Design a protein with these regions (language model features):
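Aromatic-rich carbohydrate-recognition surfaces in CAZymes
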Residues: 68, 344-440, 460-468, 597-620, ...
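Anionic coordination/interaction segments
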Residues: 1-335, 350-358, 362, 394-398, ...
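Secondary-structure capping and boundary motifs in well-ordered enzyme cores
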Residues: 118-123, 253, 330-336, 348-351, ...
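Carbohydrate-binding/catalytic loop surfaces
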Residues: 369-387, 412-414, 437-460, 510-534, ...
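Aromatic-lined, polymer-binding surfaces characteristic
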Residues: 302-305, 309-318, 322-337, 359-386, ...
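Inter-helical turn/loop segments and adjacent helix faces that build the functional surface
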Residues: 269-270, 398-411, 473-489, 614
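Beta-rich accessory regions
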Residues: 120-147, 189-190, 199-209, 252, ...
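Catalytic cores of carbohydrate-active enzymes
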Residues: 144-146, 161, 370, 466-583, ...
Length: 752
């Protein structure tokens, strides 16, 4: 397997040069209105719309859209992106950018550049096709965009499968395209109609997959085109929702011609007119493209870094932010979404605020939360409240938006309360939902979805440490807003919990913290059956501050001995070899996969943050590089990981060693952002400003970070000189705190 491609010079795009890869190289394009398309390096992919109530309309699945060209003189048909026809094109490249995907190739002297983007507004995607004739004779080409759709997501019977059909696909002159209209009452006025339109003359069209595709009607074999036929210009009232256009163009030698197409969903033809208005001119299309890029660029510019590691620069400046935004649209779960928002606080505080509101609206009056809201999962996971507290405090530090605490948000089970009340109810739930050791109950599971202890009184050391961290954060917040008595109460509770954890959760023989208790037995201790140590109690002991000074090096040593591997940090060690119903799903997973003894990147991300919190940037950097895709220990040839996004896990099972799990959908993205900006560079959020305490890797002698906050640009320059100092706009500081400013620009110079 060859090298699949390379980053652009500024890191905002990845150029794929290998047509066939271990897994499809996907890009994700989306907008605030809920439109989302996931594109492969072939220009194919899935598209969907998520509505405000979280219902999702699946427009089409992977394999549901294609672009074909046919040389009308030779009859040759091909796909410029290779798939779905497996076309033998030359000079193939795919540029996955932040906001677009462009596929380029050449076939028999005809080069094609095929760009897809999602405008900043509207439920639509735009395809731009540029064709250049490199031959010395004129040619005539048919350009055929084709979509085989689902348009499903509503609840109720699928009316289009009934004898009385409930939709029709027609060609509408005023749209210059095909229009799919549903009369299904279950759509409830939501945009389940669709339109596919062209910028220029449409010579033929089709609304019938049976007339265009050979059985079983896949886009792999466009029967009509391959047999010299044109599209049948038919109306369809049966079969699968389908739309195709055929536009014929004559191109002289050396000439380039352009066509634009738009695919979108709507409620009616009036809305369809607005969707296709983007095609009024090439200038209009490019204006929409620039608007989309400008919105993305604004997000990118709010936090920018420059370090000696280009790959880390690319990830922090572009790909982590993009990944977290995508995950917020793709996932709907308390823990997951709050951690994505955690990583976006500096670059998109308004998104973090909206996510907090949404999560709180799925919190019960007693303080606990649902696991996810789409689909709704009310299974009792114990860690929900701690993410609400940690992320809200993080947001308040950065924004100083204390009025947010007074805002009222509904509870999931009725009634409403202020944001502050929601925080306090979450803390109260964790403080009172305790087991025999006065530790937090594990309930069905905590952060580790697969650790399902069957004892109703089972306790989670992880959640208990998380509660300790929350108590610290709440104490600082209460002090900041003048509620000193509550601040003192939370401080006292923190100290009491710290003592409880250190008395009950320390494994004297192994010299590390255990994972929990169930049926009177220790989980994750030296005497435990199956797995004897877990990563999270060691890392969260540091993150929460509960580890005592004399135990810090001991847990570091234990982690190095059992948890740290060439691939990253194991969730647990050793992996459970046999199924243990009392332990749960984790023991049913094959050893060395997912949560059972694999390298779970989220757990490694906790580890690197714990390392930088201890001031050990070098150790954190070493571990971070392991979970970065295409690393020295897991190069692309081994892992198959997408080079521009983090993955969920790496297998340690000998049969699939180093292979990856799912790309994009991992909570480790927010924690990597935090590690680099607040750890390596040391620019930590605080009430009223930043604390600056860098912990750069040993071979980083200089780094920069630019942060835009409320109209002020903060420029941090960190240099390794052997002398510690901080100057703000040339004035030497006696402390490491940099206050927020209303100036246009603040320059902070740090030496270490």
């Amino acid at each position: 397997m060859s090298n699949p491609g390379f980053f652009s010079k500024d890191g905002t795009a990845y150029i794929v040069t290998e047509p066939y890869t271990a897994i499809p190289f996907t890009n994700v394009l989306y907008n605030e209105d809920g439109y989302l398309t996931e594109l492969t390096q072939w220009g194919t992919g899935a598209s969907s719309v998520q509505f405000a109530d979280k219902e999702t309309c699946t427009i089409l699945l992977e394999g549901g859209k294609a672009l074909y060209l046919r040389n009308e003189k030779t009859g040759k048909v091909w796909c410029p992106g290779i798939e779905p026809m497996h076309s033998a094109v030359e000079k193939f490249t795919c540029e996955h950018g932040d906001g677009y995907t462009t596929v380029s190739s050449e076939f028999e002297g005809i080069s094609v550049r095929f760009r897809t983007f999602v405008p900043a507004k509207g439920l639509r995607e735009v395809w731009t096709v540029e064709i250049t004739n490199h031959n010395n004779i004129a040619t005539e080409l048919s350009v055929v965009p084709m979509v085989k759709m689902e348009l499903m997501g509503y609840t109720g019977p699928r009316f289009c499968n009934s004898p009385l059909q409930s939709y029709v696909t027609t060609f509408e002159e005023e749209l210059n395209g095909t229009y799919f209209e549903t009369r299904n009452p279950n759509t409830k006025g939501k945009p389940y109609d669709a339109v596919l339109a062209a910028s220029g003359k449409v010579d033929f069209y089709s609304g019938c997959d049976r007339a265009t595709l050979a059985a079983p009607q896949t886009l792999y074999y466009p029967y009509a085109l391959l047999n010299g036929k044109n599209l049948d210009s038919s109306v369809s009232m049966s079969g699968i929702p389908f739309m195709a256009l055929q536009c014929i163009a004559s191109i002289e030698p050396g000439e380039t011609k352009r066509m634009d197409f738009v695919l979108g969903t709507c409620c009616n033809k009036e809305e369809a007119k607005e969707i296709v208005s983007v095609l009024s001119s090439e200038t209009a299309v490019e204006a929409e493209f620039e608007k989309a890029l400008a919105k993305i660029d604004k997000r990118r510019k709010r936090v920018r870094i420059k370090t000696p590691d280009d790959k880390i620069n690319y990830f922090v400046n572009t790909w982590l932010k993009k990944g977290m935004e995508y995950c917020l649209r793709k996932k709907d779960a308390t823990r997951d979404n709050l951690q994505f928002a955690f990583g976006l606080t500096m670059s998109e505080p308004e998104v973090t605020k909206d996510t907090i509101r949404l999560a709180m609206s799925y919190q019960y009056k007693d303080g606990h939360t649902v696991r996810s809201w789409l689909p709704l999962d009310e299974t009792y996971y114990s860690d929900g409240p701690l993410w609400i507290v940690l992320v809200t405090c993080d947001y308040l530090k950065y924004t100083s938006d204390v009025d947010f605490l007074k805002e009222k948000v509904p509870y999931f089970d009725g009634g409403e309360a202020t944001v502050l009340d929601h925080l306090q109810s979450g803390i109260e739930r964790l403080c009172t939902d305790k087991g025999p050791h006065n530790l937090c109950l594990a309930r069905w599971a905590d952060w580790n979805d697969a650790l399902n202890l069957d004892d109703p009184n089972a306790e989670s050391v992880f959640v208990s440490m998380g509660l300790a961290w929350c108590l610290k954060e709440m104490s600082v917040l209460m002090k900041y807003i003048g509620m000193d008595m509550l601040a003192d109460k939370y401080t006292t509770s923190y100290e009491e919990l710290k003592e409880i954890i250190n008395q009950n959760c320390w494994d004297e023989k192994g010299e590390y913290y255990v994972r929990g208790f169930s049926h009177g037995k220790v989980i994750g201790g030296t005497e435990s059956e199956g797995s004897t140590i877990y990563a999270n109690p060691q890392t969260w002991a540091v993150l929460s501050g509960v580890v005592t000074a004399e135990r810090v090096e001991k847990i570091v040593a234990a982690t190095d001995k059992y948890i740290v591997t060439d691939l990253g940090c194991l969730v647990n060690y050793p992996a459970y070899a046999e199924a243990m119903p009392e332990i749960g799903r984790i023991s049913y997973q094959y050893p060395g996969t997912v949560e059972n003894g694999a390298v779970y990147c989220h757990a490694t991300a906790f580890k690197i943050n714990a390392d930088v919190m201890r001031g050990d940037g070098e150790r954190a950097y070493r571990e971070l590089k392991k979970i970065m895709p295409d690393s020295e220990t897991t190069p692309y040839e081994v892992s198959g990981a997408l080079p521009y996004t983090l993955t969920s896990c790496y297998a340690t099972n000998e049969h699939i060693w180093g292979k990856t799990g799912r790309p994009w959908l991992t909570g480790s993205q927010g924690w990597m952002m935090r590690c680099v900006v607040e750890g390596f560079l040391g620019i930590q959020k605080a009430y009223g400003g930043f604390y600056v305490t860098p912990a750069m890797p040993d071979d980083w002698n200089e780094a920069e970070c630019m942060i835009e906050r409320n109209g002020t640009e903060y420029v941090f320059t960190i240099k390794r000189t052997g002398v510690e100092s901080i100057t703000v706009d040339g004035v030497m500081q006696k402390q490491s705190f940099v206050a927020f400013s209303e100036k246009e620009r603040v320059c902070v110079d740090i030496t270490m």
